[in-house]
Amino acid sequence: MGVPAKRILPYVILGIIEEHGQLSGKDITKEFTTDIGEFWKSSHSQIYPELRRMTTDRWLAVVPNQDNDKEIHYQLTTEGRQILNQWLQTPNQALPVSKDLFSLKMFFIKDQDDPRMAVLIENQRRLVEASLAHLNERKKRLFSSPQAIRESYGHYLILERAISRQQAQLQWLAGVTPPKKG
């Protein structure tokens, strides 16, 4: 049974559980505040219904927690692992559409002398610099050795891509500073 194109969350959950072996719903939710959260967001209210659906569909199996009988852990079934592998092998058909408020606001400013433009650009520069510092810190913390890079190479590449994007955005912002009057 496949997932509709728009439902990506089940694959994200499968990947997270595959990476850790088995996790509780709480642990899965926490993953969205760290590594996965750098490029994919999901809330508790989305995750738990999806876990129930995936268990019903037999993509996940419930594993009792020996330390806490009220806490449920999930692990991939053979079918869940096959579905994840099939999804990973399927080429993307389109680039994602970005919901970028900065771009949207800039789009609607017509006059290059509009004072709002300089404010938007400066604010965006500060946000991008903060993001870049955060990403560089994560890279330093997570990938300080060649072995760490080898063990999570895909994660390393995604982090490198994010750093590259932020560096390119800073370069672009430096080049579009509105001309000063005078």
Predicted feature residues:
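Acidic interhelical loop/turn segments
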Residues: 137-157
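Amphipathic alpha-helical dimerization/coiled-coil segments
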Residues: 86-130
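Long amphipathic alpha-helical coiled-coil segments
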Residues: 179-182
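Mobile beta-alpha loop/short-helix "lid" or hinge segments that flank ligand
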Residues: 96-104, 135-144
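Basic helix-turn-helix/winged-helix DNA-binding cores
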Residues: 1-97
